[in-house]
From Swiss-Prot:
Its EC number is 5.4.2.7. It holds the Pfam family Metalloenzyme. This is Phosphopentomutase. It is found in: Cytoplasm. InterPro entries: Alkaline_phosphatase_core_sf, DeoB, Metalloenzyme, Phosphopentomutase_DeoB_cap_sf. Keywords: Cytoplasm, Isomerase, Manganese, Metal-binding. The gene is deoB. HAMAP family: Phosphopentomut. It comes from Chromobacterium violaceum (strain ATCC 12472 / DSM 30191 / JCM 1249 / CCUG 213 / NBRC 12614 / NCIMB 9131 / NCTC 9757 / MK). CDD domains: PPM. GO terms for cellular component: cytosol. Mn(2+) 2 binds at D303, H308, H356. Mn(2+) 1 binds at D10, D344, H345. Isomerase that catalyzes the conversion of deoxy-ribose 1-phosphate (dRib-1-P) and ribose 1-phosphate (Rib-1-P) to deoxy-ribose 5-phosphate (dRib-5-P) and ribose 5-phosphate (Rib-5-P), respectively. Its cofactor is Mn(2+).
Length: 405
């Protein structure tokens, strides 16, 4: 049976989009700048030298970056790729995770999300009062834009003493809630997020994110793998839902199910960290052979651990770690399978601030029936969803053009 294995390298942009100036992101290039820093010896913590990505290079990542940005990533292997490679522009209004993923699955976000734009006192008082009342809270902390790690150091101890949850946001359409797993309780945090999700309906906010953490005090706090995203449902049927409705298997690895609000997902594998994500992907490929299938994984640590934290050396090391296991999936492909590597937005670790960057994404497609070579600029991320639909014999999506035609 035909299958599509889709691996999302969360935040691996490959060059600023034409509308990047609108977002303050003109000149951003997540991969290009990581490669530049690595080649210059400025990303040598835990690794050293130029980026060593032989397998991603074989997939055409460097060549896709060159098509997108006009220059080849410094230090990467320029050998001819064995896959189809190109880059895609985003037509969705935002540079956030749901917008990128939904557009990849054929449903671009052509409306404007709601945002909490004020950096301090970010949330409407009426909303905060309603959350406190309905959840029976002693109060709240934060109410601001913040980096997830910084705000734990600043407010984590007070949260543990008072039981007040930490509320914060970013440039994305998001309401984030951080609570200590042991002193506050994980299920209690999830219930608080559910209440908040319901109260946010009039505000058109994309996601509520539970951000559980552990640790004894400042400098010792760490997020756990029990993050949970409560997203609104996509406004139309994604290619995932179309396959599920047709009786196929749609397998979520990691946070994919949360991003699509669990719509169109038939099987879920919880996984945290690269090794678990790789292992779960390989397990799913072994288990789902008898029906047409989409197996989709999100490698979130690129974004959450290195992009937002502006950790260039960590991002470089993570790319090399990802690259080392890529051959396992390539070897597990059947004769009629395709492997697609892409991203959902950028998050340039060399860029000012802590937010995502508006960039093109790589579109890399490998398979025994796939013609290697350039597929050029794709007018929308939805070309990926359209290509998956074509590969699996599903009805055409409303957006996108297949690069497999």
């Amino acid at each position: 049976m035909k299958r599509a294995i889709i691996l999302i390298l969360d935040s691996l942009g490959i060059g600023a989009a034409a509308d990047a100036p609108k977002f303050g992101d003109a000149g951003s290039n997540t991969l290009g700048h990581i490669a530049m820093e690595a080649a210059a010896g400025r990303a040598d913590i835990g690794r050293s030298g130029p980026l060593k990505l032989p397998n991603l290079s074989r997939m055409g990542l460097g060549h896709a970056c060159q098509l997108s940005s006009g220059y080849f990533p410094e230090g990467m292997d320029p050998a001819a790729p064995a896959a189809a490679y190109g880059y895609a522009r985003e037509i969705s209004s935002g540079k956030d995770t749901p917008s990128g993923h939904w557009e990849i699955a054929g449903v671009p976000v052509l409306f404007d999300w709601g945002y909490f734009s004020d950096h301090d006192n970010s949330f409407p008082q009426q909303l905060l009062d309603a959350i406190v009342d309905k959840a029976g809270l002693p109060g709240y902390l934060g109410n601001c834009h913040a980096s997830g790690t910084e705000i734990l150091d600043r407010l984590g101890e007070e949260h543990m003493k008072t039981g007040k949850p930490i509320f914060y946001t970013s440039a994305d359409s998001v309401f984030q809630i951080a609570c200590h797993e042991e002193t506050y309780g994980l299920e209690r945090l999830y219930e608080l997020c559910k209440i908040t999700r319901e109260l946010l309906e009039p505000y058109n906010i994309g996601r509520v994110i539970a951000r559980p953490f552990v640790g004894e005090g400042k400098g010792k706090f760490a997020r756990t793998g029990n993050r949970k995203d409560l997203a609104v449902e996509p406004p139309a049927a994604t290619v995932l839902k179309k396959l599920a409705d047709a009786g196929g298997d749609v397998v979520s690895i990691g946070k994919i199910a949360d991003i699509y609000a669990h719509v169109g997902i038939t099987h879920k594998h919880k996984a945290t960290g690269f090794d678990q994500l790789w292992d779960a992907t390989l397990t799913a490929m072994d288990q789902h052979r008898d029906k047409p299938a989409i197996i989709m994984a999100n490698f979130v640590d690129f974004d959450s651990s290195y992009g937002h934290r502006r950790n260039t050396a960590g991002y470089a090391a993570a790319l090399e770690e990802f690259d080392a296991r890529l051959p396992e999936v390539m070897a597990a492909l059947g004769d009629d399978d395709i492997l697609i590597l892409s991203a959902d937005h950028g998050c340039d670790p060399t860029w000012p601030g802590t937010d995502h960057t508006r960039e093109h994404i790589p579109v890399l497609c490998y398979g025994k029936q796939v013609k290697a070579g350039p597929i050029g600029e794709r007018a929308t991320f939805a070309d990926i969803g359209q290509s998956v639909a074509a590969h699996l014999g599903l009805p055409r999506m409303d957006y996108g053009t297949s690069f497999l035609d």
